[in-house]
Every structure is written in C-alpha cells, then in structure tokens.
Amino acid sequence: MDARAPRPEARFAAGKAGYAGDMADQDFGSTDFGAQDSVADISAVDIADWRLRTFALYANVRKIAAEDPAEAHSYWRQERDRMFGTHPASPLTAAAKSSFGGLKTADYDPIYRFHIPLTNEGAGREMNVETGTDGLVRFVRLGTFDLPELGQLAVWKLNGYGGGIFVPFRDATAGQPGGSYGAGRYLLDTIKGAFHGVQGSGPEAEFVVDFNFAYNPSCAYNEAWACPLAGPSNRLAVEIPVGELY
C-alpha cells in the first residue's frame, strides 16, 4: 500500500518521523535509493501491469507453497528481483536499477510460518492516516493476530474504495546494521495482492502468516513514495530476522 508523488509535508514520506516513529537512513549496498525519479512519468498502463504481475506472483506463491513453502519463497525472491530491476513501474530510480544486484532477503526459515485465527481483540477501532497524495486514508481494525512467542499484530481493513486487509509491522531488527528497514515492513496488503491465503472457513478459519515473505514498503527504496507504516499496535519487541532486509 504505497502512494505516489507525496507533497513535502507528507507524514509518511521516507526519512521523516511520522506515525511509525523515526525512520532510519540505511545504505543498501552501493545503491543510492534516495534519488527521486519523477513518478508522475510512470504511465497508468505500466502501473496496471505491475499490479497484475504482483497478483499473479502471489497466486503462484500460494500454489507452490501448498507443497513447498521454501520453493515458493525462492520463486518470490527471483520474481521480485526481476520486477524491481526491469519493470518501468518499479520504485527503483533509473540510477538504482543500473547498479541493482537484487533485494537483500534472508533465507527461508519455516519457524516463521504460521496458521493462526483472527481474534476479535481491538476490532472496530479506527485509524486515520494522513498521506501526501490521497489525503486522509481511513482504516478500521478487524482484530488481532496472536503470534506464538512473537507478540500481537493489529489487522486492518482499508475503509474505502477497494477495501483490503493490511498488516504492517516493525520488529527489533528495524534500523539495525544488517537488519530491516527502520520504519518497518509489510506482512499482508491484499489490495496490492500480497496475501498467503486462509485455511478453513467461519470461526475455524486460519490465516497463513509467513514472515519470510515480509517486504519493504516502496518508500524504503525511493523518497518519492509515501507509505502507511507500522503504528504502536503493529510493533514486535522481538527480532524477525527473515524476509526482506535492508
């Protein structure tokens, strides 16, 4: 869930303090992700193609993961690297693409894959996020994921056109050397296709939650993007050393 072309005062622009707290400026190899290309030059057709490819990517991930989650993770890494490095709607600038060697992603660890129910804790709470492009973005809380030995994460629904389930998070690796992006990562963002499925139905339904597929918001790679980030209800005190790093 990323917005384009934020105004300078956008609360969630990379490098600024906002809802998620201070955002750390980190190096990503020799690539400078701070330089801004004009995102206004990205065509609507290219954006639509990026979205279609992302939905197809996660559909294939779910299919492969039903038999072999680690293989699905390898496929996910390969396809994301290809899209980031070559697609015209990639958040990487032209300069960053020229030296791009792949996203920094940890190897798969099955202990970070869960099948968990959505509890009612916190359900109905509203959260309004001021962005620089879409004005006030409204969320309503659907409930909570209780993650064994890790903590709790609020589960949000975009309360507007398109809907969608949204779960950002920030863990103890955020902003640390060799760790994750200082402002946090995304776990689920169904309006953009990032979803790993639900097993069962009704009260017995369980979400597939796999931190190995956690990924950085686009603003981690380009300051021209603004992104809703992890607030107090979406922070974990423990380290999550898997997924996309920074």
Language-model features: locations:
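A compositional/structural signature for long, glycine/proline-rich flexible linkers
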Residues: 21-162, 166-175, 186-191, 202, ...
